[in-house]
Design a protein with these regions (language model features):
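Generic beta-strand/beta-sheet core signal
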Residues: 125, 183-185, 207-208, 282-284, ...
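Solvent-exposed loop/turn segments at secondary-structure junctions
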Residues: 102-106, 128-132, 187, 211-213, ...
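Mobile cap/lid helix-loop segments that gate and shape the active-site cleft of serine hydrolases
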Residues: 207-270, 291, 295-299, 307-312
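Primarily recognizes the serine-hydrolase "nucleophile elbow" in alpha/beta-hydrolase
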Residues: 163-232, 259-260
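Short, solvent-exposed loop/turn and secondary-structure capping segments
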Residues: 81, 94, 108-112, 133-137, ...
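Cap/lid segment of the alpha/beta-hydrolase catalytic domain
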Residues: 99-171, 214-220
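Loop/turn elements at helix/coil->beta-strand transitions in domains of secreted/extracellular proteins
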Residues: 92-97, 117-121, 176-179, 200-204, ...
Length: 354
């Protein structure tokens, strides 16, 4: 049995910092600007700047059904992009799924085949080429060395990789850059939530099992009397995150490590920054660490912005049975969204009642 505790009310989403109500698209754009400044700077340490130079080098070109390889060089820093193209009868320009989790085991033949079978290109890079995922590895490597005066964390560095990969996709003629969706798992899911928030070119955003610092809720904690799929007995907290992965975040988050109730933001604000674009959150019911009820609470709160913009059907929360992984169930749901199918929330009543 799960039980939950709400530490404090979620901060106001549809009020400006000075208390002025947000009532229409114009005032939402102003509020969006406030949130980008407050949340991105505090939670993530800001973002790396847009590069002054960027070039895309073709390393290999193939016919339909093949793999094209590219080197992206941003301000002199290189990383690599592979594009798996669908076979005939699909013809370019292809919509594309952009996936920065080239470092995960989930990027396998079945994953590629499912994307291509539906007529999409799959563009893959390894976010670890941008910044290390090892605690205490320092800031002398990766893109930290490009911008030593900046204080962004690893999540921002990885999200920057998505932005630069999107720059590349816009230059590649067989990609339909107006129909690019991004997905990632766990810390990769946190990454795509950030990338989707700061860059409106991404038409579809899918964080999978992203938990605390992703689609969860800092203010809501869950405890269980039986272990979850990973043996966990409770949801992850900000203290847990900062003890193990402080380098993912901005330094200011340390102030709130044991006082999440006082955070001036929560993850409903990150979700709202996607509006009115499609945001599909995919979660696993036995993934207690990822805080399924917290995800539901911030989802429901973010709906207010989607409703204001006349796009309530574009924010979706889908649960599946199982544990912490990126499976074909979640991928298929995301491709359904990208094909324009309407998916409904499927939050179980027992999750709502925690």
């Amino acid at each position: 049995m799960l039980k939950g505790k709400m530490l404090s009310a979620l901060p106001e989403l549809l009020k400006m910092d000075d208390g002025t109500p947000v009532t229409d698209r114009e005032s939402w754009r102003a509020r969006r600007g406030e949130l980008l400044k407050t949340v991105i700077d505090m939670e993530y340490g800001g973002m790396p700047p847009e590069p002054k130079t960027l070039r895309v080098e073709e390393l290999s070109l193939t016919p339909p059904g093949g793999i094209n390889c590219y080197r992206i060089v941003a301000d002199g820093y290189p990383f690599y992009l592979r594009i798996y193209k669908p076979s005939l009868p699909f013809r370019p320009p292809y919509p594309a799924v952009l996936y920065g989790d080239g470092c995960w085991k989930y990027m396998n033949d079945a994953f590629i085949a499912e994307v291509n079978r539906r007529g999409f290109a799959l563009a893959v890079f390894d976010r670890l080429e941008l910044a290390s995922d090892v605690k205490d590895s320092g800031r002398s490597a990766g893109i930290y060395a490009l911008y030593p005066e900046r204080e962004f964390g690893a999540l921002s560095a990885w999200a920057w990789g998505y932005l630069r990969a999107m720059d590349a996709l816009e230059k590649i003629s067989f990609i339909d850059a107006s129909r690019v969706g991004i997905t990632g798992h766990s810390r990769g899911g946190k990454t795509v939530l950030l990338a989707g928030a700061v860059d409106e070119r991404f038409a579809f955003v899918n964080p999978n099992n992203s938990g605390a610092g992703g689609c969860g809720c800092y203010r809501f904690h869950t405890e269980s009397d039986t272990p979850g799929g990973g043996g966990e007995m409770r949801s992850e907290t900000l203290r847990d995150l900062l003890n193990n992965f402080d380098f993912w975040f901005g330094r200011e988050m340390q102030k709130y490590a044991d006082d999440e109730a006082s955070l001036p933001f929560d993850q409903h604000m990150m979700k709202a920054l996607m509006a009115p674009r499609v945001l599909l959150q995919t979660e696993a019911l036995n993934d207690i660490w990822a805080n399924s009820k917290g995800t539901y609470l911030t989802h429901e709160a973010a709906k207010a912005v989607y409703r204001l913009l006349g796009a309530e059907n574009n924010i979706i929360l889908r649960y599946r049975e199982g544990n912490h992984r990126h499976d074909l169930n979640a991928l298929s749901a995301f491709l359904d969204c990208m094909e324009g199918k309407t998916l409904a929330d499927n939050t179980p009543e027992w999750v709502k009642s925690i």
